[in-house]
């Protein structure tokens, strides 16, 4: 699969795997740096894809896109 054919989810899954590997802290320096660089690239690509999706939603909704709050487990625990 070429880079251009990867979905947002593919990139996000790879980014999560990279973060997990880096958090373990047992990689050789060179491998850690290479993974960090790959992660930076993936992060930028995901941000670009999200911005494109947001712009598409703006077009479909006539420019009326409102931000919304996403309840997290912490948010719902704080409400109790």
From Swiss-Prot:
Main localization of the protein described in the UniProt heading: cytoplasm
Enzyme class: hydrolase
Record InterPro entries: Exonuc_VII_S, Exonuc_VII_ssu_sf
Keyword line: Cytoplasm, Exonuclease, Hydrolase, Nuclease
Domain of life: Bacteria
Pfam families with a match to the protein in the record: Exonuc_VII_S (PF02609)
Catalytic function, reaction form: Exonucleolytic cleavage in either 5'- to 3'- or 3'- to 5'-direction to yield nucleoside 5'-phosphates
GO MF annotation list: exodeoxyribonuclease VII activity
Coiled coil: none
GO biological process, one term: DNA catabolic process
Subcellular location(s) per record: Cytoplasm
GO cellular component, one term: exodeoxyribonuclease VII complex
EC numbers on record: 3.1.11.6
Subunit (UniProt): Heterooligomer composed of large and small subunits.
Function: Bidirectionally degrades single-stranded DNA into large acid-insoluble oligonucleotides, which are then degraded further into small acid-soluble oligonucleotides.
Assigned protein family: Belongs to the XseB family.
Protein name (record): Exodeoxyribonuclease 7 small subunit
Gene name, Swiss-Prot/TrEMBL: xseB
